[in-house]
């Protein structure tokens, strides 16, 4: 009875948006990358809310969005599904005060992060005929991290984007992570992973 009551409460709160559904999390998202089905980057849109600060001043903060749950990173590259920071989505980042050796090391790490992101999305979306899935895969396949900073759309917000801001994809007027078909793909993958690692509450 207690577990049923807790489950009902959880589902009610999730439906109201007061907590994230299982397999999803609320994350700070700063930019949206609009892409077409061929994977071309069409525009970069800032996603900031204006909030009141101290002494009557206002400031801009990233929007909070419900996206596929963030992975736990320890060492190595581990990408998030349909959102992440510039190292994973664009394969590039910026850091002040680096010498040449440090910069080269970071660039190599960024490339590995991007490759991890591309591999994750291919493993999840390969063979699917959904337009949004094709758009994301085409973007990741044709994007060249080495030329990211030369892209005029990225350059508009280079300082903010490349300093660790999180971003999502937009396709055909909507956020890709909100696409019902891709959300279903994530739900199934998350449920399968949970089944593989889950424990019984009674037996452990």
Q: Which role fits each region the language model picked out?
A:
Residues 1-198, 204:
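Conserved phosphate-interacting/catalytic interface
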């Amino acid at each position: 009875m207690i577990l049923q009551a807790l489950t009902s409460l959880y589902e009610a709160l999730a439906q109201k948006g007061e907590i994230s559904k299982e397999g999803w999390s609320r994350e700070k998202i700063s930019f949206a990358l609009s892409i077409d089905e061929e994977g071309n980057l069409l525009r970069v849109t800032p996603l900031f809310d204006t909030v009141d600060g101290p002494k009557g001043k206002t400031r801009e903060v990233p929007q909070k969005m419900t996206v596929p749950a963030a992975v736990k990173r320890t060492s190595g590259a581990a990408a998030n599904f349909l959102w992440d920071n510039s190292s994973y989505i664009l394969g590039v980042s910026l850091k002040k005060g680096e010498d040449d050796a440090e910069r080269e090391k970071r660039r190599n790490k960024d490339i590995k992060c991007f490759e991890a992101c591309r591999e994750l999305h291919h493993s999840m979306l390969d063979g699917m005929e959904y337009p949004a899935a094709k758009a994301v895969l085409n973007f990741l396949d044709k994007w060249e991290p080495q030329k990211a900073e030369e892209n005029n759309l990225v350059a508009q917000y280079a300082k903010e984007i490349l300093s660790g801001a999180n971003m999502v994809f937009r396709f055909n007027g909507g956020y890709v992570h909100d696409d019902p078909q891709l959300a279903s793909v994530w739900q199934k993958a998350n449920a399968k992973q949970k089944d593989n690692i889950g424990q019984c509450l009674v037996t452990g």
